């Protein structure tokens, strides 16, 4: 029996004060985890330069209390306008 490969993906977006973070995955949870990994890498880099900001830059476990994550779902080979499928 053959199984069909996933024909879609999800993009998780989080807009902070200075940057738009994105993560992509086959579903919302994997997209969210990819986004949080990007945030963790960003935070680690910042704290290497500014260790005194540890308390003011939230970690990935608490970032969602500060910024909302939005999800965009896409189908492969489809065309979109402003997040809405047109073809």
Residue ranges and their predicted role:
Residues 2-20:
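Short aromatic-glycine-(Arg/Gly/Cys) micro-motifs in beta-strand/loop hairpins
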Residues 40-87:
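Short, mixed-charge low-complexity intrinsically disordered segments
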Residues 17-30:
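A short, exposed loop/beta-hairpin motif centered on an aromatic-Gly-Thr core
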Residues 18, 36, 41-42:
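Structured catalytic/translocation cores of nucleotide/phosphate-coupled proteins
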Residues 11, 21-23, 69, 76:
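Generic detector of N-terminal low-structure segments
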């Amino acid at each position: 029996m053959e199984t069909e490969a996933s024909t879609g993906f999800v993009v998780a977006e989080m807009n902070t004060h200075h940057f738009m973070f994105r993560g992509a995955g086959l579903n919302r949870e994997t997209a969210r985890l990819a986004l949080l990994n990007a945030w963790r890498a960003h935070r680690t880099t910042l704290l290497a330069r500014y260790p005194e900001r540890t308390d003011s830059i939230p970690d990935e476990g608490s970032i969602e209390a500060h910024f909302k994550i939005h999800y965009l779902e896409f189908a492969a080979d489809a065309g979109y306008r402003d997040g809405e499928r047109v073809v």
